[in-house]
């Protein structure tokens, strides 16, 4: 019965993610109440950041910020699916998702937009296509996070890290 409940919730979450990833404010009516405030806050914050970047740098960063957040939410959904289905991913499966779920790529995009004196589409493309060192630096972040994760998080049912995948 619990598995059936989770599968129903999973399909609802996937539907919610579909609406949220369209980045359409009109889609907010399709979201459940608990997600409306979260989506509105994220939507407004990202629009404000993109507007400021366009005004100050002449570059539209919206698509890059949106992609980062959609990728992050999808990776969280993968981890949720593993957890609720009792699936123990292989180390490769875990790491293929974990370097995104640690939020490294989205932090790098936001850092670049906030700190860079000259924003270029080429650099944004490089950051959001996860080329070069992005996966590696995010993997280091994930490993450090998993190594330093306090035991109390593991005791409250926190999702597995690579050490209990092995």
Regions found by a protein language model. Give the residues of each.
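Alpha-helical, largely C-terminal catalytic domains
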Residues: 1-166
């Amino acid at each position: 019965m619990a598995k059936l409940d989770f599968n129903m919730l999973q399909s609802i979450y996937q539907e919610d993610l579909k609406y949220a990833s369209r980045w359409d404010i009109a889609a907010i009516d399709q979201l459940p109440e608990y997600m409306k405030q979260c989506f509105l806050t994220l939507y407004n914050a990202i629009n404000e950041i993109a507007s400021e970047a366009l005004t100050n740098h002449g570059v539209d960063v919206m698509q890059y910020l949106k992609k980062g957040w959609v990728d992050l939410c999808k990776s969280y959904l993968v981890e949720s699916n593993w957890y609720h289905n009792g699936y123990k991913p292989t180390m490769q499966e875990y790491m293929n998702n974990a370097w995104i779920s640690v939020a490294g790529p989205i932090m790098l995009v936001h850092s670049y937009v906030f700190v860079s004196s000259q924003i270029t589409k080429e650099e944004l493309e490089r950051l959001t296509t996860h080329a070069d060192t992005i996966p590696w630096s995010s993997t280091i972040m994930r490993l450090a996070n998993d190594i330093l994760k306090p035991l109390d998080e593991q005791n409250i049912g926190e999702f597995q890290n690579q050490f209990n995948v092995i």
